[in-house]
């Protein structure tokens, strides 16, 4: 895997993902990929398949709708860490970032406290449905709270992904590590996203395997 591809986080999130596909994918790439993201129901199985490697297993919380209460989200976070997740993406509505200062501070404090029982938590937002002003406000709230990691979008068109990475990189603070999830990507796009400020690029396993087909040698991994 080349340097650009080391930033890739593969997303195995389709509801119809079979155990056979999960097993085949993890067995094939567990010694070369750094991380994969699965649904909560697949955490334990993915951890078993990843044994003997350094592959990190992440999971999504309140995905894709981001409509759960804080109590429900907190419960799901705790359960996911108990199942063995190394990191979590916690999907939040834009309204969560628009709360009064105390409300958002309490939210981030609660989520931070849950990391003490498990691993890393990355906030995730549906920036693809936000207007420009809301994106700026969300980025600024992340900066105010010194939040370290954000995941942006779900299968976002590349041009929009580049724009939003640049925006959050500019307004979210120097502490913010950004992951973007574009709908498609090639080597040039990987370089452009990273140059714009993305530290991780989330790809579906279909897009990831298409990317590998474009490599000059079959043993690129």
Language model features with spans:
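Active-site-adjacent beta->alpha loops and helix N-cap segments on the catalytic face
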Residues: 38-56, 67-75, 95-115, 129-135, ...
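Glycine-rich phosphate-binding active-site loops on the catalytic face of alpha/beta enzymes
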Residues: 59-64, 82-97, 144-160, 183-185, ...
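Generic structural signal for short, solvent-exposed loop/turn connectors between secondary structure elements
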Residues: 1-7, 13-20, 30-33, 98-103, ...
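Generic structural signal for hydrophobic
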Residues: 25-29, 80-83, 111-114, 141-145, ...
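Short, electropositive alpha-helical surface patch
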Residues: 53, 116, 137-147
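Conserved N-terminal beta1-alpha1 strand-loop-helix module at the mouth
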Residues: 1-82, 141
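Electropositive, surface-exposed helix/loop patches at the edges of structured domains
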Residues: 97, 121-140, 178-203
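Hydrophobic faces of well-ordered beta-strands that scaffold small-molecule active sites
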Residues: 3-15, 34-38, 55-63, 86-90, ...
């Amino acid at each position: 895997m080349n340097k650009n591809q080391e930033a890739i986080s593969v997303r195995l999130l389709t509801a119809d993902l079979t155990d056979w596909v999960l097993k085949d994918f993890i067995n094939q790439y567990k010694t070369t990929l750094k991380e994969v993201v699965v649904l909560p129901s697949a955490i334990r199985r993915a951890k078993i398949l990843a044994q003997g490697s350094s592959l990190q297993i992440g999971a999504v919380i309140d995905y894709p709708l981001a409509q759960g209460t804080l109590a429900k989200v907190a419960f799901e976070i705790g359960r996911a860490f108990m199942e063995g997740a190394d990191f979590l993406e916690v999907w939040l509505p834009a309204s969560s970032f628009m709360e009064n200062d105390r409300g958002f501070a309490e939210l981030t404090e609660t989520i931070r406290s849950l990391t003490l029982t498990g691993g890393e938590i990355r906030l995730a937002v549906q920036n693809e449905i936000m207007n420009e002003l809301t994106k700026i406000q969300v980025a600024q709230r992340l900066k105010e709270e010194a939040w370290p990691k954000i995941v942006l979008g779900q299968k976002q068109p590349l041009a929009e992904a580049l724009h939003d990475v640049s925006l959050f990189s500019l307004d979210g603070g120097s502490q913010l590590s950004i992951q973007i999830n574009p709908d498609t990507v090639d080597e040039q796009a990987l370089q452009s996203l990273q140059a714009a400020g993305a530290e991780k690029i989330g790809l579906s396993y279909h897009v990831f395997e298409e990317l590998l087909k474009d490599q000059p040698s079959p043993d690129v991994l």
